[in-house]
Amino acid sequence: MAVGLINGRLAADEEARAEVDVLNSRLEKTSQLTKKIQACLARLDATGKSVRDVAGPLSGETRKLQVLGNNIDAVIAAIEKLRSPADSKNDEEQIIRMGPEKAGLPNYLASIKRLNKALNDMKASNLRSTQQTVADLQRLVKTGNSQLESSFDKLLRSETPRAIEPLHYLTKNMPFPVLSQEKITRLGLMNSYLTGVHQQNTGAGSSQESPVIKIYAEVRAQYLLSTLGNLATASTNTAKKKTPEAVYKAGTNGMGTYAQAMEGLFLAEYDNICSIFMREDWGPVFQATCQPALVELGRTLRELNSHIKSHITTDCYLAYEIVEIISSLSSNLENRTGELKSSLAAALKPIRETAKSSLVDLLEETKRQVNSLQTLPADGAPTPLATQTMQRLQSMVNFLRPISSIMISIGDGGWKSAAASKGGATDTIPSLVSFDVGADGQEIFAHYCADTIETLLSSLDARARVLYQQKKAVIGVFLANNVTVIERMINESGLVTLLQSRLQVLDVWRKKATALYTETCKEISIHLFDTVHTNRTARPGSGQGMVSSASIMKGLSSKDKEKIKGMFTAFNSGFEDMVARHKQFTMEKEVRQMLAQDVQHMLEPLYNRFWDRYHEIDKGKGKYVKYDKGSIAAVFRSLY
């Protein structure tokens, strides 16, 4: 049993030794393999180093070759690019020679844009070999631009009539015609391109006008000028009157229609311009297009101004009307377009200055006409000058709006100075900014009317004192008649609302007239102031009532009685003469009543007192005492 165990242990040891031997054998092989690998790695490292030493320079050269290759490719591409315009030049030239009408505007514009791009690219390359191609392209572009301008001109002219009849549109309240939308689109495309070319050639900030603007302004300006020509002529012709003395009536001149047509045409033209041109060009194009028509307007206004100045007393109202018409036209156009205000102001200036100076001229003319009177009505009738002057003021009320603006511009009382007639104003249409905003034009005009009336009456008074040779009664009647005519014409017209608070000027002159007329009454009344001293014993005591005429007569001496008789006789003579002259005078109804009342109030109480005291002087025979209280009252009533 022990031998068996030993044998088993020996066998296991032998087996373990065998495994160890195997492992040692494998370890030795592994060690040998490792040494071989290390030797291979050493050789590989040496080989890699040699490769690196050789491959490094080759890599740098390769990169250089790659860059060179890329550059060559770029040059080839550039050459191809430069060759492309030259190759396509014939195709583009064919389109250009066809023109925008045949080739079609979009196709034509695309072609000319391609030519421009090719030309710019070639100029940028600056290659000597492309100089001929550059010259050819420049020629084509120039031809294309020229044809495009010609096409713009041709299309615009084909759509622009020589003239239209403006009254057709005004009477039917129709808008003035504009260019068709299809034509506007084509014109806009051409303008957009040609304007860009012009800015490129001259610089964006250049003040030089684009050829397209010149073409448009030339074509459309002639259309506007021709359309408005007949209305301009009509405005001057309607100013001519068959009767030189006839006063101008509002609306009878053609200027209103002329301005209305001008406004409609100009606004329609502005719509065209806004649809075709770029915004920054709207103002310049509009100004250039309208300028010839505005020049003609200025010429027309100067001609009318000459006519007005030659007939200032009858046609000054035309100046006022034109001021309002052109001011309204300017305001409407400025509100819509922001343009033409200064041009219209310059055209209006002569008329406006004449309108301002007319205020002074009319006052001076009033004085001149009065001073030129060689005779006045012997019966004291009112002078036609009073009626004419008031008719002038009444007519002015019909033009109150323009007159109010003129009044504000010259200031209250400005018509009293020569400066108003010289007109040193600038070429501007006044606005509220240029005025005293607190000024009331109507109030200033009312002041002017009052000054006119005062000037008229003062001049008539001075002239009457000369021509009537200080005959106060007829002077009084004359002044009173004229005052009444003036007052009546104020109350029966639009002047009443303006002058209601200023009628005191007439009251002053009415009192002057009454005072002059009643001077005769004062002379007559002297004969009714007795200074006879009666006997004290004949005087009634206090509270005894009035002493009878018979009692007074008893107390008079013969000398006093003769004196009383003479006073009655003198009164009768003066009174009858005054009554006769009163009835011979030509008086307005109001004047006759006023003066009759003043005479009665002045003389009747004095006569009644005198009659009460002394009517018994002729015992009722009527030799000296021709009028009793009743009969003289009847005479006074007959004066009314």
Curated annotation (Swiss-Prot):
Gene3D superfamilies, per database record: Exocyst complex component Exo70 (1.20.1280.170)
Pfam families in the cross-refs: Exo70_C, Exo70_N
Molecular function via GO: phosphatidylinositol-4,5-bisphosphate binding
InterPro entries membership: Cullin_repeat-like_dom_sf, Exo70, Exo70_C
Biological process annotations from GO: exocytosis; protein transport
SUPFAM superfamilies, per the entry: Cullin repeat-like
Family indicated by similarity: Belongs to the EXO70 family.
Localization, UniProt: Bud; Bud neck
GO cellular component entries: cellular bud neck; exocyst
GN (gene name): exo70
Organism: Neurospora crassa (strain ATCC 24698 / 74-OR23-1A / CBS 708.71 / DSM 1257 / FGSC 987)
Function: Involved in the secretory pathway as part of the exocyst complex which tethers secretory vesicles to the sites of exocytosis. Also plays a role in the assembly of the exocyst.
UniProtKB keywords: Exocytosis, Protein transport, Transport
UniProt name for this protein: Exocyst complex protein exo70
